[in-house]
Amino acid sequence: MGIQLLPLHRMEERHIGLTQAIADCFYEAACVCLDRHHAPPQEFDLHGDSFKQKTLVEWKSTDDRSKKAWANKDDATRDGAYAFALAATELCLGLCAVSRAETLTGADYYIGLRDKSTDDLENCFRLEVSGTDLDTYEVNRRLRGKVKQALKGKSNLPAIAAVVGFRVKLITMQKVYDES
């Protein structure tokens, strides 16, 4: 089997926790982040607790208007990382966005199985996300920080931390376990 495509396009059709406007916004931010360092398409490494694989990332190069709209690098990186992390959890774990998480939960999104009822978050995971344009060391440092943040969250749901390294073409994910 060939390299699987990272499912960044039309995410609202699979992630009920995203509207079309939000999915489009996250995708556009991701394109701006990718264009800082690369030309399409590119292969990214995807690392998780029990897997290491490559994924193909395809995107449309952004124009000057999009780059100016996303001139705040922090906002673009955060929102682009949301797109990548949600697409990666879908591809590797079969989990999709169910809802945005509340403040202080130690997460950005709740993710769950696509074909399960989402009225109750009991069967969901929390997803804590970060993105960076720096090196692999920084990706790993941020992952450790996101794990700690998820552990401190005011929620008893299990969590997954994810960090996207746009420059180094790396997506890392780690399940978070409460050791108490």
Which sequence ranges carry the predicted segments?
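A recognition module on extended beta-rich or small alphabeta surfaces enriched in W/G with H and D/E
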Residues: 2-12, 16, 20-24, 130-179
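Short beta-strand or tight-loop elements
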Residues: 105-107
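Conserved catalytic cores of phosphodiester-cleaving nucleases, focusing on short active-site segments
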Residues: 84-93, 109-111, 120-134
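Nuclease-adjacent, charged terminal/linker segments that flank catalytic cores
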Residues: 1-60, 64-70, 174-180
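Flexible, charged surface loops at secondary-structure boundaries
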Residues: 119-124, 152-156
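Short beta-strand
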Residues: 98-103
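A short, highly charged nucleic-acid-interacting micro-segment common to nuclease
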Residues: 66-81
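A generic structural motif
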Residues: 112-114, 164
